[in-house]
Amino acid sequence: MPANTKPYSRLDMAKWVLQAEAIAQSKPLPPYLQTRLDAMREGLAEEIAYLQGAGKINNVKLRGASVDLSYLQQDSAAYKYNNAKAHWQLLNHNNNGYLYGDGFNAVGTLHISGSLSKDLAVGITPRFSWDKDEHGDASLIEGYAKTHLGVWGITAGRQPMSWGVGRAGQLAFGSNATPQTAIKLNLLEPHTFDNGALKFLGKANVNVFASRLEGNRVASSGSALEKDHAALVGVRVDIMPTDAFTIGLERMSMLKKFNKHWLLGDNADDAEKDNWNDIAGLDFKYRFPGVQVYASLYGEDQAHAFPCENAYNVGMYFPQLVPDGSWDLRVEAAKTNDAWYGHWVLKNGWTYKDAILGDWLGADAKRVYAEVNHYLADGGKLGLSYTWADMQQTAQHDGRLQEVELSYSKSLQKDLLLHTAVGYGKLRDDTSKLVAVGLSWEY
């Protein structure tokens, strides 16, 4: 089972394709799944050949391109949180910090990646957009170089990351905010505890990263106690006692400076001496026959070196509503308390470039999420999702939100994918309506 850390590398995905093909030798796949597996094999042909010892990975090239057109009719462009300097938008979550403009939106992306040698991989994904509010804009979703030193992978640059479990959102660190430029270390392969006292742990993977936040945090917060270019560091260990069970331990810290008190977890009671904001906790995923169960329990603060002011999410994924697996279902619930994502010294809160680094749900909130998907034999997919949330529950206004979205995707030809969506969202008396259509090419 993959660790609960994204993104996955192309080599990782190639290994999983080979594993799936080995399983399919004794247990034939249903048509819809075979179509998807064949498409992945074709897209990862060079990596698969390399793993089989029949080729080299010197393949930096254009991997894909996409054009997305959407029309958004909204009563409000964005909504603010009570205790964090950030905003969010109806029908637009976990989108790497990007907001839609009111009315017509056009977005184009190019994805270029590959390996310069067996020791160096690179990737770049520029994004070009236009809407009537911001007019034309160009940005970089990702741009990175990756190498290795012994058993460690080393990545430098910008790359969207998400840690933890949950489809609707991750509590500490997800894809809701703009990707950061960071240095990341990870084990290239999980460490196996073959013998000894720790054999019961099975396998373990480690991810570590460090980045800097934006340089205008003092001015935007209006507080001299804030820190421009504060550090953001994260450590995550995924332990896999069995192939069906993964447990993750995670600590994320927003730091004014490094010192022994942070290492030991000794919080200061004086605002002048409080130099960090932590989110830490654990999550797990267990795969039973016919259902996967996952949950998180994280603390936004600490008491005696242990997390407190807790939040949680819990979910169940049913991969086979019918015997061939062409229908699946996911249901989730999440809850945060009123301390989440805010801080008494770092006034901007748990944010980066006006978006929460964790779950868009925010503080003092709860959410129920459900989605059902039907996978078609030609590789297409039909999906329906529903979100109900009560945001900022103790605020004076009514924060109840409902969103429903219907999506459909279909392969028009070998390397061309059509994807469409319609959505409706409501918050108090405000509504938002979305119609989107896009084309993606894979090369």
Predicted regions and their residues:
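Structural signature for solvent-exposed beta-strand/loop edge elements and short helix-capping sites
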Residues: M1, S9-L29, M40, P160-A182, ...
